[in-house]
C-alpha cells in the first residue's frame, strides 16, 4: 500500500513539473527579446521627453519673443507720443505768435487811424492862420486880433505873476525889436523886470538865481526868461513875418 501511494505521489510530482516547465517555456522571454523591448521603451520615453521639452522651449521662446515685440511697441508708442506732444506744442506756439503779430498789426492800424482822425478834427476845427497843433489858448498870439496871447502856457506863466506887467513890456519889446543884435534896445525894460523879480524872489527864484544863491545879472535873467518863452517867440516872429501879428501890440 505504501508503494502504491509513493508511486502515485511521484507520478503527480512529475506531471506537475512537466506542466510548469511547459508554462515557463511559453512565457519566458529570451535575452535578445528583452533587450529589444527595453531599448524601445527607453527610446519611446526619450522621444516623449524631447518632444515635451522642445514644446516647452518653443513656448518659452514664443513668450520671450512676444515680450520683446510688446516692449518694442511700447517704446514706439512712447516715442510717437513724445513726437506728437512736441509737434502740438510747436503748432500752439506758432499759432500764438501769429495771433500776437496780427493783434499788433491791428493795434498799430487802429492807433494810426485814431491819430489821423484826431489830426483831421484838429485841422478842421483850427482857424486859418493859427499855428498847427495849437488851440487859441495854446497859441502865442491870437490870429483873430493879432495880439499876443498872454494866457499861452508857452510863456511859463510869467505874464500873470507879481511882475507880469514888467515881463509883458520886456517880452513885447524883444519880439518886435528890429535892432541888431535883436533886443539890444530893450535892456532897460529887462532891468526893470529883474528889479521886480528881486522884490519877489519866492516867485522868480529859478529866473533870478543862477546855479546856487548868487544873484544873476540882467543879461542872465534876460537869457533865462527868453529861453523859457522860446516857443512863443518863434510863433510870434513867424506871425510878424506873415503880417498876422500887429507890431508894438500893447499889453493888457
Swiss-Prot record:
Main location: mitochondrion
GO CC entries: mitochondrial inner membrane; mitochondrial intermembrane space
Motif extent (Cx9C motif 1): 163-173
Disulfide bonds: 152-154, 163-196, 173-186
Domain of life assignment: Eukaryota
Record localization: Mitochondrion inner membrane
InterPro entries: CHCH (IPR010625), CHCHD4 (IPR039289)
UniProt record, GO biological process: protein import into mitochondrial intermembrane space
Bilayer disposition of the protein: Single-pass type II membrane protein
Domain CHCH, residue spans: 160-204
Motif segment (Cx9C motif 2): 186-196
Molecular function terms, GO-annotated: protein-disulfide reductase activity
Keyword annotations from UniProtKB, A to Z: Disulfide bond, Membrane, Mitochondrion, Mitochondrion inner membrane, Oxidoreductase, Protein transport, Redox-active center, Signal-anchor, Transit peptide, Translocation, Transmembrane, Transmembrane helix, Transport
Biased composition (Basic and acidic residues): 90-123, 239-252
Cofactor or coenzyme needed: Cu(2+); Zn(2+)
Annotated region (Disordered), positions in chain: 90-143, 230-252
The record's free-text note on cofactor binding: Cu(2+) or Zn(2+).
Positions on the Mitochondrial matrix side per record topology: 32-37
Span of chain positions assigned to the transit peptide in the UniProt entry: 1-31
Membrane topology, Mitochondrial intermembrane segments: 55-252
TM regions (residue ranges): 38-54
Purpose: Required for the import and folding of small cysteine-containing proteins (small Tim) in the mitochondrial intermembrane space (IMS). Forms a redox cycle with ERV1 that involves a disulfide relay system. Precursor proteins to be imported into the IMS are translocated in their reduced form into the mitochondria. The oxidized form of MIA40 forms a transient intermolecular disulfide bridge with the reduced precursor protein, resulting in oxidation of the precursor protein that now contains an intramolecular disulfide bond and is able to undergo folding in the IMS.
Free-text domain note: The CHCH domain contains a conserved twin Cys-X(9)-Cys motif which is required for import and stability of MIA40 in mitochondria.
Quaternary structure note: Monomer.
Official protein name in the record: Mitochondrial intermembrane space import and assembly protein 40
Species of the source: Candida albicans (strain SC5314 / ATCC MYA-2876) (Yeast)
Amino acid at each position: 500500500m505504501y508503494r502504491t501511494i509513493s508511486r502515485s505521489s511521484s507520478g503527480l510530482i512529475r506531471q506537475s513539473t512537466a506542466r510548469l516547465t511547459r508554462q515557463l517555456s511559453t512565457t519566458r522571454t529570451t535575452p535578445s527579446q528583452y533587450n529589444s523591448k527595453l531599448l524601445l521603451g527607453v527610446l519611446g520615453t526619450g522621444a516623449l521627453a524631447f518632444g515635451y521639452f522642445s514644446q516647452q522651449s518653443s513656448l518659452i521662446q514664443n513668450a520671450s519673443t512676444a515680450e520683446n515685440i510688446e516692449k518694442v511697441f511700447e517704446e514706439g508708442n512712447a516715442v510717437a507720443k513724445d513726437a506728437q506732444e512736441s509737434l502740438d506744442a510747436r503748432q500752439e506756439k506758432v499759432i500764438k505768435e501769429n495771433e500776437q503779430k496780427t493783434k499788433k498789426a491791428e493795434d498799430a492800424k487802429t492807433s494810426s487811424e485814431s491819430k489821423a482822425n484826431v489830426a483831421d478834427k484838429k485841422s478842421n476845427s483850427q482857424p486859418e492862420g493859427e499855428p498847427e497843433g495849437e488851440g487859441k489858448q495854446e497859441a502865442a498870439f491870437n490870429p483873430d486880433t493879432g495880439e499876443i496871447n498872454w494866457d499861452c502856457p508857452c510863456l511859463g506863466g510869467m505874464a500873470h505873476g507879481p511882475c507880469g506887467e514888467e515881463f509883458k513890456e520886456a517880452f513885447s519889446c524883444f519880439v518886435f525889436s528890429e535892432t541888431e543884435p535883436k533886443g539890444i534896445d530893450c535892456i532897460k525894460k529887462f532891468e526893470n523886470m529883474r528889479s521886480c523879480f528881486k522884490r519877489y524872489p519866492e516867485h522868480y527864484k529859478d529866473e533870478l538865481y543862477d546855479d546856487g544863491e548868487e544873484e544873476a545879472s540882467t543879461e542872465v535873467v534876460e537869457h533865462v526868461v527868453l529861453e523859457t518863452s522860446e516857443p512863443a517867440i518863434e510863433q510870434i516872429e513867424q506871425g510878424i513875418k506873415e503880417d498876422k501879428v500887429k507890431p508894438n501890440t500893447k499889453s493888457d
